[in-house]
Curated annotation (Swiss-Prot):
UniProt key word Nucleotide-binding: yes
SUPFAM superfamilies: C-terminal domain of alpha and beta subunits of F1 ATP synthase, N-terminal domain of alpha and beta subunits of F1 ATP synthase, P-loop containing nucleoside triphosphate hydrolases
PROSITE patterns: ATPASE_ALPHA_BETA
Protein's gene: atpD
Protein's recorded name: ATP synthase subunit beta
Reaction it catalyzes: ATP + H2O + 4 H(+)(in) = ADP + phosphate + 5 H(+)(out)
Origin superkingdom: Bacteria
UniProt enzyme class: translocase
Native source species: Alkaliphilus metalliredigens (strain QYMF)
Family, similarity comment: Belongs to the ATPase alpha/beta chains family.
Amino acid sequence: MATGNVGKLVQIIGAVVDIRFSSEEIPALLSAITIQGPDGLVTVEVAQHIGDDTARCVAMRSTDGLVRGMEAIDTGAPITVPVGRETLGRIFNVLGEVVDEGKPVEAKMHLPIHREAPSFEEQEAATEIFETGIKVVDLIAPYARGGKVGLFGGAGVGKTVLIMELINNIAKEHGGLSVFAGVGERTREGNDLYHEMIESGVIDKTSLVYGQMNEPPGARMRVGLTGLTMAEYFRDQEGQDVLLFIDNIFRFTQAGSEVSALLGRMPSAVGYQPTLATEMGALQERITSTKKGSITSVQAVYVPADDLTDPAPATTFAHLDATTVLSRQISELGIYPAVDPLDSNSRILDPATVGQEHYEVARGVQEVLQRYKELQDIIAILGMDELSDEDKLTVARARRVQRFLSQPFFVAEQFTGMAGKYVPLKETIRGFKEILDGKHDDLPESAFLFVGSIDEAVEKANKG
């Protein structure tokens, strides 16, 4: 595949290398170039042309051991990765190489990681609800089939656990294919996820692509595109409804900001790259539904210092159909998943899409929780006795609703000792409607904590 163009390394600064070619043979932007390093082949991607004859490139592997004067060979094409059924059950790196110590993948087809987003004619608007079996998500911030969902949260509030539960539920209940792109997260989590998928039997329906924290920024910047390319194949060639999980989209931005200064760009707000919105758009616009199939994407978004106005999460917000916000205050109450029902929202929580009953119950839940939040200052200063009877009832119901929003997860069984629960949407709506209507005012609050359906809460209270 190589064009035979040979260049020479003239400068190496961390993850960025400059390669000099003869002026008429300089490789195109985004071309892959290979360099034979002491520890194997190093692939770099052309990011800029400097002068007439120099290509400034970003490395996909560590540049340790590279020296000036080494030969670099132009492949004449962007990075291409294997796609198709052969990729299921395997772990890949950014270059599409197998990293699970298994035998190499013999895919019938390879595709470049840089592609145009589908045109307007090819796209299809998503209005259908995608059931996850997680009560708080399905009720308050329902996901659209073929939509984009963001999981926002600081460090350690449960973003990755929620993603793992979604993978588990969707593989078991919907039998759909998933692609998981691990972008700049912990190697241990990637390893745990792989082994849990083997144990739960969902590995055969999933392709995994990892570029962990210890990888150079070039790999972390491009690994999301590698996963997306694999998902696009299932959507376009096989007409599948694919799930694309990205954990963590913030690390994609972070990697871009690491190489941006080395590429000589002036930093923008808070030190981020000036091309932040463009880079994010190039990735997000390819995640969409077409007339052939859909890609439903769930993206964990790390929020630096819990500040939602930071440019990285703020830029991500613009692309999302639903946001699931994880709150430290709720996790401190011991309620998991720690989803904030007042901060989370969805574009499809609309009577025309979800139906009148679902809409009214969801808004009723938010109303009662909002009133409880307003009353908390009064309760803290004066105590419950100073509230009117109506407010006392609101608080009692709000506390039951708050606890009923918790749920035991399948993927956390080994830590919690509680069996996981999948709750159908109809059961979720019925349960919250009955609590709001006061049918369960006689049950103790503890009965609602970590149960599936409302019938289980009643059963738990009766066992006492």
